[in-house]
Amino acid sequence: MEVTDVRLRRVNTDGRMRAIASITLDHEFVVHDIRVIDGNNGLFVAMPSKRTPDGEFRDIAHPINSSTRGKIQDAVLNEYHRLGDSEALEYEEAGAS
C-alpha cells in the first residue's frame, strides 16, 4: 500500500489543529478528514473520527499496523512542511465548508 496523493488545507483555529488532509491510497481509495494536530511533542496526524454519545472519539478509518500508520503520517507531514507557511496559501476557517 502506498500513499499516492495528498491534498492539504491549512485551517485557522484557536485550537491545535493546523490542517485537514485527504489521502489517496494506490490511486484507488481516498480517505478524507485526516487532521494535522500540533501536539505537546510536535505535529502528528489524527485519523478521521466520530464522537460517540458518551463523548469519546472513535476512529472511522485507521491503519491496522504501525508501518502503515507511519507511511500515512510521513506523507501528510511531508506535504504540510513542503507547503510551508507561505502567504500565498489559502487558509480555511475551521468548520467552514
Curated annotation (Swiss-Prot):
GO terms for biological process: asexual sporulation; division septum assembly; sporulation resulting in formation of a cellular spore. Signal peptide: none annotated. Gene3D superfamilies: Stage V sporulation protein G (3.30.1120.40). Essential for sporulation. Interferes with or is a negative regulator of the pathway leading to asymmetric septation. This is Putative septation protein SpoVG. Belongs to the SpoVG family. The keyword Cell division applies. The gene is spoVG. The keyword tRNA processing does not apply. Keywords: Cell cycle, Cell division, Septation, Sporulation.
